[in-house]
Amino acid sequence: MARTSARRAGTSLVVVLVALLGGKADAQDSAPLSRSTTILLKADRITYDSAHDVVVAEGHVEIDDKAQILLAQKVIYDEKANRVTAKGQVSLLAPNGNVAFADHVVLTNNLRDGALSGFRALIGRSGRVVASSATKRGPVVVARNAAYTPCTLCVRTGRTTPTWALKASKVVYDQSEHRIYYHNAVIELWGVPVFYSPILAHPDPSVKHLSGLLRPSAGTSSSLGSFVLLPYYIAINDSQDATIEPVITSASGDIVRGEYRQRFNNGGMWLQPDVGYAPSNGRWSWQSALFGAGQIPIGDIWDVGYNAAITSNQTFLKRFNISNDVTLNNDLYLEAISGRSRFLMSGFYFQDLRVGRVNQNEIPIVLPAIDYTYIPREAVAGGQFRLNVTSASILRNVGASDERLSTQMRWQLPMITADGQLITLSAEARADVWRVVGDPANPGLVTDLQGNPIPAGVHYIDRAQPMLVADWRWPFITQTSAGHSYVLQPIAQLIAAPYGGNPSGIPNEDSTDFELDDTDIFSVSRMPGYSLWESGPRANVGMEAEAYFPGGSIEGLVGQVLRPKADPIFGVNSGLYGTRSDIVTRYRIRFMPYVSLTQRLDLNPHSGTVDRDEVYFHGTFGRSSLDVSYIRLDRQAVSLGAPRAEINGALTLGIGKHWSAFAAARRDLQNSQMLDTELGIGWQNDCLGLSIAYQRSYTRFLDVAPSTSILFNIIPKFGGEADQNTPLFPRNAFSEPMQQAAIP
């Protein structure tokens, strides 16, 4: 009779409750015997001594009471003493999949209590427990002189000493609390004791989460000194939990990092507060930060959401490796979705941490911003109609403030011709009105779209812009008998729109980070936000090509914007200068799952130079991998500042069966200087991972000097799914050097 069940990590001692009545049975009898509970008893021989009320089952005994299974060579049931004795290769199969073994088992007290000698158990995928003896008193199981290890042992290969083991003079498993306690616990590495604790505890496999200490970690840094992280996990309920993590350093003060998570049926929330006493510009002070995100349902159609990122100190995040962001964005919103309409009201707050940052009073607060969209279900003139109404109030303590109201209507009609041409006709109209209040004391802090200062006083500006678009695409598709597919698709978009549309006096609030690239070359309106309008007749032309074959693919794109007359709003470095834009290209080659190569090029038709060059390579070769990225931007876009060039590489090298090495580097090619480097070496097998990593940051951020860090990582594995997701080295060497993985 074959029986299988899923296993979970943890310790479980199982007592089989049987009530046997009956008479003599022949070999291989299968007899359902019952008094209060029906069970199945199978054995080679079953005898019943009616004078002493004793049942003896011998030879391949199997007892199944639908809750657990007992296997043994011999089972004796003394009904008067209410005692069950099992001998010879005793196996106890628990409902959760764990299996216990013993040489001898005695069960008493209505089979609730008992004793096991020569106790062993299989736990989860690979865990093993060995004890000289074990006893059970109700829900509490006590094992003496016990040892636990998840490591595979093999006498044939000579691996008889586990890589690591947890030994204890006494192990107590309280099934009512779902927790396992180890008394006088000693952790051994390769048979050598390395850690002692009077008591250790962890939850049993049936518990999804339970409060307790997570794996600590440590390291040393030239900026922080020696540091240690001591995370503690708090299980609030099935949908809420929290983590408190003290970070203790010898040179830069101490902080406490927290995390709170809660999941709803249709949403969730996350908060990460950080607070500590640390130095800044030569003075010690209390510093803090808060990150978070959430979406909280408050009805059938309404949600409240937020994104939080704020700090009290300019260098706090960088000093403790909390975040490398230098611009922090916060928003709070109220959203409703009903049918085919959506309403969104939000507010935004920004914080600038950059070196040479502007005064925080000059950074705007957006409150409120309103966005309403309606798409009727019925077709309008055969096409789809869309109405969008938005408004925004932008407030500054210093500098000009403004309010905007915009209404946009769009009609779209897609068509497919008999020969496969894809034609989409659309018409669009947008009207905007601004109320701008200039700051007479600071007239030049905010400029309009032409770069002119916003004058003092109250000004009203309006504009209306219609647009007609014809989008044409004709995909040519062919397939071969070898399993190859080819797609060639020419694209042409004709846009008819009047010139102008960007009058003076409109503050450039949300169109400063425009970038022409392969993601928007075939967009009829490339401008982000509502401040800047791409006006005038133009054509977006180009082609896409794709080839698919067994094991890989090749994709390519080329596109350009053509105009009969230059738009003066776009300068030399915009990519849209003159009557011909940059020629935007992209290709991607994939040989799955081994190699992926992507390159993006923007060619300047006026100078013949390359304005943008991006290359991304990923290769996987067994246990080794290589990632390289290169970017060069010669265009001085507003959001990017001066031209820059950078190369970033990361190599993971598998060496033999257990060893691996890691190296990563990032270099500023524009200024010929290194930014970050990291080197690491690690060893791991089926139950333990060890690594040491060296990190060097070459950049200075105010009083946070370039630093060198050494990180130590010890990852005990317990045979659970979490082990598969625990990296031996940090996933991102340069943004989260202190990232940790918790003990499952």
PLM regions: where:
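Bacterial N-terminal signal peptides
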Residues: G10-L20
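N-terminal secretory signal peptides that target proteins for export/translocation
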Residues: M1-R7
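Short, Lys/Arg-rich amphipathic segments at extreme N-termini
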Residues: V18-A19, K42-I46, A470
